[in-house]
A protein has these predicted regions:
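Short pre-active-site segment immediately N-terminal to redox-active cysteine/selenocysteine motifs
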Residues: 41, 46-49, 94
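Thiol-based oxidoreductase modules, predominantly thioredoxin-like and allied folds used
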Residues: 45, 69-83
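The canonical Cys-X-X-Cys-His
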Residues: 50-53, 98
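Typically the conserved alpha-helix immediately C-terminal to a functionally engaged Cys/Sec
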Residues: 54-66
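Non-catalytic, surface beta->alpha helical segment in thiol-disulfide oxidoreductase systems
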Residues: 94, 99-135
Length: 135
């Protein structure tokens, strides 16, 4: 599920590991034995008017498709008034920022700037996610 929400600054590729934050609203709830097992929530904080953020849109769609029912992809446009609260909630300093949450909603990785799909693949595979084709 890719949520389009909708402007900021950009610095190429800064990564930060393990920031202890939990967002209960984004924790995947497996309420039945047949529900898909979501392992990761990928939160993209950016804007539809930010050029590097726009470049992340196809990456997010591809990741969502490749990892299907193992990942939830969420996009917040922090330049829209109703979504600015997420910039504060996640403590972002620039956009785009990608925040990755484990199945319990705990942040395990954060990246600032454009994040290439190949690097996201490596991160997700370290977390045990498999592509639809199994690799």
């Amino acid at each position: 599920m890719l949520l389009s929400l909708a402007p900021g600054s950009f610095i190429q590729g800064q990564s930060k590991k393990l920031v202890k934050r939990t967002n209960p609203a984004l924790v995947a709830k497996d309420t039945s034995a047949h529900a898909p097992k979501l392992l990761v929530t990928f939160v993209e904080l950016g804007s539809v008017k930010c050029i590097p953020c726009k470049a992340m849109q196809p990456v997010m769609r591809s990741i969502e498709k490749k990892y299907a029912d193992q990942i939830k992809v969420v996009f917040y446009d922090v330049w829209k008034a109703e979504q600015q609260k997420y910039a504060d909630q996640y403590g972002i300093k620039l956009i785009p920022t990608q925040v990755f949450l484990d199945k319990d909603g705990k942040e395990f990785f954060r990246h600032e700037g454009f994040y290439p799909e190949e690097e996201i693949d490596k991160l997700l595979q370290k977390q045990g996610l498999k592509t639809r084709s199994g690799g």
